[in-house]
């Protein structure tokens, strides 16, 4: 019994050893197959990606290949397939550019007018007590108000104290002492007391509103013993002054009520000063309200522009990730169109873009761009920051253009690079 048990255990051990050896052999064979497959795949990848340079250029091989295809194969189907392929490339490019351009703009417009702006207006007008978004807007508002005050002061210097008597129109009766009577007197050379009393106009001033055709002019007459003939009045006024309106087309003078300047001069000055002061205060109040409303709207607009542009940028990034295949097709089509041009046109296009962005006149364009950008987002306009950006950004773009021309264009089209340098020189 002991001998039989030992024999069975020995056979089991032999069976286990043979089984594990067979498994190891299979694993080794599978590993060898995988290694051989990986080596063959590497060789295939290398053979696919690497193309040996032969005796003739590769363009000759492509030309001969195309020639034999047109000679021995069905040319009509090849032409139709090629046309369909380029049509697909063109439609894909147009569709991709349309989506990348108009979808972010549409998101910007809709979110700005129907989502972000109402929320911003509600928060800014209810929870915020400020009008100005930053100190730069406040400084601009104070500058405009100061200029308006200087304008009013300049207009007040042009007005004299006697202008309450000159420049009165028929529809303007500011002072009750200058009420027009309904009596019209014709010019006459005879007077009931003496022939030497004539009405002599002392001054004549009119507003711009009176410079219309057949409109009555208002001026001041002074009676004096002068032989120089001016419109002679039929009445003698003891005060020596008379306000009259003359209609020269009818040769008539319509009399106003006499003004006794000796009694009413101080009162007229006081009335004029009070009226002028009241009008100046009203104009200042109206201007201040206009400035407050304008800069409040400008602050809301700046905040709305910022959040709407952020949302548009997120949309653009999503489209760039989502439309990766269409973007690659678009790039290949645009590159093919670009390299399909002749050397002079390619050089002219490159020269136009580089001169526009980094040329001699580009600092003015960049300065205008940054000023518009700061106004768009309500940022304080700092000339130092603008000059710093204008001095650095075109230099970086110039270096980038030179690298692209040297790295890529010099390989793809050396004749274009030579033509470009010839145009620059």
From Swiss-Prot:
Location(s) in or outside the cell: Plastid, Chloroplast inner membrane
Membrane spanning stretches: 89-109, 300-320, 350-370, 386-406
Primary localization: plastid
Region of interest called Insert, as start-end residue ranges on this chain: 159-278
Entry superkingdom: Eukaryota
Record carries keyword Zinc-finger: no
Xref: InterPro entries: CemA (IPR004282)
Residue span of region Disordered: 173-192
Reactions catalysed: K(+)(in) + H(+)(out) = K(+)(out) + H(+)(in)
GO biological process: potassium ion transport
Keywords: Antiport, Chloroplast, Hydrogen ion transport, Ion transport, Membrane, Plastid, Plastid inner membrane, Potassium, Potassium transport, Transmembrane, Transmembrane helix, Transport
Skewed-composition ranges (Basic and acidic residues): 180-192
GO cellular component assignments: chloroplast inner membrane
Membrane topology: Multi-pass membrane protein
Family statement drawn from the similarity comment of this UniProt entry: Belongs to the CemA family.
Record-linked HAMAP family: CemA_PxcA
Function: Contributes to K(+)/H(+) antiport activity by supporting proton efflux to control proton extrusion and homeostasis in chloroplasts in a light-dependent manner to modulate photosynthesis. Prevents excessive induction of non-photochemical quenching (NPQ) under continuous-light conditions. Indirectly promotes efficient inorganic carbon uptake into chloroplasts.
PANTHER family, alphabetized: CHLOROPLAST ENVELOPE MEMBRANE PROTEIN, CHLOROPLAST ENVELOPE MEMBRANE PROTEIN-RELATED
Protein name per the record: Potassium/proton antiporter CemA
Origin species: Tetradesmus obliquus (Green alga)
């Amino acid at each position: 019994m002991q001998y039989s048990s030992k024999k069975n255990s020995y056979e089991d051990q032999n069976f286990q050893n043979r089984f594990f050896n067979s498994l190891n052999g299979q694993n080794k064979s599978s590993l060898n197959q995988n290694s051989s497959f990986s080596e063959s795949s590497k060789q295939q990848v290398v053979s696919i990606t690497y193309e040996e340079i032969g005796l003739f250029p590769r363009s000759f091989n492509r030309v001969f290949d195309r020639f034999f295809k047109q000679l021995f194969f069905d040319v009509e189907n090849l032409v139709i397939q090629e046309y369909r392929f380029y049509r697909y490339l063109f439609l894909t490019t147009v569709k991709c550019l349309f989506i990348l351009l108009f979808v972010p703009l549409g998101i910007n417009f809709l979110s700005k007018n129907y989502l972000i702006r109402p929320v911003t207006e509600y928060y800014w007008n209810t929870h915020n007590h400020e009008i100005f978004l930053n100190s730069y807007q406040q400084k601009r508002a104070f500058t405009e108000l100061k200029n308006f005050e200087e304008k009013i002061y300049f207009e007040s210097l042009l007005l004299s104290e006697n202008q309450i008597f000159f420049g009165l129109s028929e529809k303007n009766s500011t002072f009750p002492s200058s009420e027009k009577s309904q009596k019209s007197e014709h010019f006459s050379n005879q007077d009931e007391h003496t022939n030497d009393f004539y009405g002599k106009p002392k001054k004549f001033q009119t507003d711009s509103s009176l410079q219309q055709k057949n409109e009555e002019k208002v001026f001041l007459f002074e009676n004096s013993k002068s032989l120089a003939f001016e419109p002679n009045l039929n009445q003698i006024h003891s005060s020596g002054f008379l306000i009259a309106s003359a209609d020269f087309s009818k040769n008539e003078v319509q009399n106003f009520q006499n003004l006794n300047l000796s009694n009413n001069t101080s009162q007229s000055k006081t009335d004029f000063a009070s009226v002028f002061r009241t009008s100046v205060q009203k104009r200042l109040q109206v201007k201040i309200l206009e400035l407050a409303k304008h800069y409040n709207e400008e602050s809301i607009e700046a905040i709305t522009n910022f959040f709407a542009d952020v949302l548009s940028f997120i949309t653009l990034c999503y489209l760039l990730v989502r439309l990766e295949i269409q973007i690659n097709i678009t790039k290949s089509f645009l590159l093919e169109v670009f390299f399909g041009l002749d050397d002079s046109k390619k050089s002219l296009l490159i020269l136009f873009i580089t001169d526009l962005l980094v040329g001699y006149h580009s600092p003015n364009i960049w300065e205008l761009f940054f000023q518009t950008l700061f106004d768009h987002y309500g940022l304080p306009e700092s000339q130092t920051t603008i000059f710093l950006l204008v001095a650095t950004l075109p230099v970086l773009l110039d270096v980038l253009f030179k690298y692209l021309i040297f790295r890529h264009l010099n390989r793809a089209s050396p004749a274009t690079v030579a033509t470009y340098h010839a145009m620059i020189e």
